[in-house]
Amino acid sequence: MGSRYERLQKIGEGSYGVVFRARDVTTGTIVAVKRIRLEKEEEGVPCTAIREISILKELRHENIVRLLDVCHSEKRLTLVFECMEMDLKKYMDHVGGDLDAGTIQEFMRSLLSGVRFCHERNVLHRDLKPPNLLISREKELKLADFGLGRAFGIPVKKFTQEVVTLWYRSPDVLLGSTQYGTPVDIWSVGCIFAEMAIGAPLFTGKNDADQLLRIFQFLGTPNRQVWPSMDTYPNSSNMLSRPEFQQTLAATCEEQFQTNPAYAKLGPQGIDLLRWLLRYEPSERLTAAQALEHPYFSVEF
């Protein structure tokens, strides 16, 4: 880890390395050290790590975890980040999944502020989920784990489809879309918003088809009016011709919004915002900037 950082304890394992809490011996500051093993030296640094480094060096914002230092040796790459108390998933577990209305609103404002900052700089996060949102001791929420993040230019490049943990994946990506932009992050934000209210993930599919079916059960089976581009994706005909997608499912969300007391925490404005984040048609989802202007953020809880 180098003589500058004194290892304290292991706090997690990411997609390509181990994360430790450590002390910067020169300043006494507690930091998070992500150590990335370079399995085959001739291959050098994993491209996912290079991507994360280049993105994070550019992104300086109060709602994005700060990359403080990069140490590179032949066999190891070490990224030093500001240390956060816990991730949103652990935080929700810690409070029994029961976040109060004011905390949900504050976390949503922070989440959308971080996402807006990324999107304005042509960066997609592409893996937004509670374990990748870190909470400080002062209850500030910050975006982390940009391993899948990628700058997007115009024209939109074709991306790999395997992004965003299944439960937070948008219906267009589930149908094989590889040409997408900011709306893929916005769908994930909507899923996280609902999860903070109800204390559990909104859509817990076992595979792509099951995930899509759960979305249809909640929002109702879409038609071409609701989702004009639904037939244009690579897997549309294959997926939507399956027997389980032949029946038209009525939306259960309206009943849940009325009867599930957990949603009452969001209030009518919060439920309206959630509807705009979870739109089938990607171009109809609010942008992060538009979402921050939503009346929900003027409500005092």
From Swiss-Prot:
The modification Phosphoserine is found at residue 15. The modification Phosphotyrosine is found at residue 16. SUPFAM superfamilies: Protein kinase-like (PK-like). The active site is at residue 127. Its EC number is 2.7.11.22. It is an enzyme of class 2 (transferase). This is Cell division control protein 2 homolog 1. Belongs to the protein kinase superfamily. CMGC Ser/Thr protein kinase family. CDC2/CDKX subfamily. InterPro entries: CDK, Kinase-like_dom_sf, Prot_kinase_dom, Protein_kinase_ATP_BS, Ser/Thr_kinase_AS. SMART domains: S_TKc. It comes from Trypanosoma brucei brucei. GO terms for cellular component: mitochondrial outer membrane; mitochondrion; nucleus.
